[in-house]
Design a protein with these regions (language model features):
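N-terminal leader/targeting and accessory segments in enzymes
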Residues: 1-92, 96
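Phosphate-binding loop of NTP-binding sites
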Residues: 10, 58-61, 74-155
Length: 155
């Protein structure tokens, strides 16, 4: 997915909280033709996005890709099973951002100590480079900052 084409494509963003809203704005900024939005709970309207009230509506739409917010559990999720049945590729908002980010990436995973480790690495990198972005699931969505990255950036 490193060369993900966004221009003139149709997307579904599944999960419309902070990260989902950021993904919608990012997709439109990169020339997406249509962006549908869906959330298992209540979600606000987003300008230019088309809200789906029923996930089964994806059967009648020509969706190229689905972007998942971090809160969407893929295991045992009937909506994800439908995407797979319809051969609609899906990825996280974070992966979407990584496909378009310039520069280098530092990714931290694990069970304990992620926030402390992230803050420590961020502070260390900032002493050497002023193009360091702190983003991901805990703070700022990656799609909120990726349009500001350069080849010298570190995410």
């Amino acid at each position: 997915m490193g060369n993900l084409e966004i221009l003139a494509k149709t997307f579904l963003v599944y999960g419309i909280q902070t990260t989902g809203k950021s993904a919608v704005n990012f997709l439109f900024s990169r020339g997406a033709k249509t962006v549908y939005i869906y959330d298992d709970g209540d979600c606000d309207e987003i300008q230019d996005a088309i809200k789906l009230d029923n996930f089964d509506d994806v059967k009648n739409l020509n969706i190229d890709y689905c972007i998942l917010s971090p809160g969407v559990n893929v295991l045992g999720n009937k909506n994800i099973e439908l995407l797979e049945k319809l051969d609609i590729p899906y990825m996280s908002e974070f992966c979407l951002g990584l496909t378009k980010a310039q520069g280098r990436n530092v990714c931290i995973t694990g069970t304990n100590g992620k926030t402390t480790t992230t803050n420590l690495i961020y502070d260390l990198l900032r002493t050497q480079n002023n193009e360091v972005f702190l983003c991901g699931n805990r703070d700022t969505p990656i799609t909120q900052v990726v349009n500001n990255t350069t080849k010298n950036s570190i995410l």
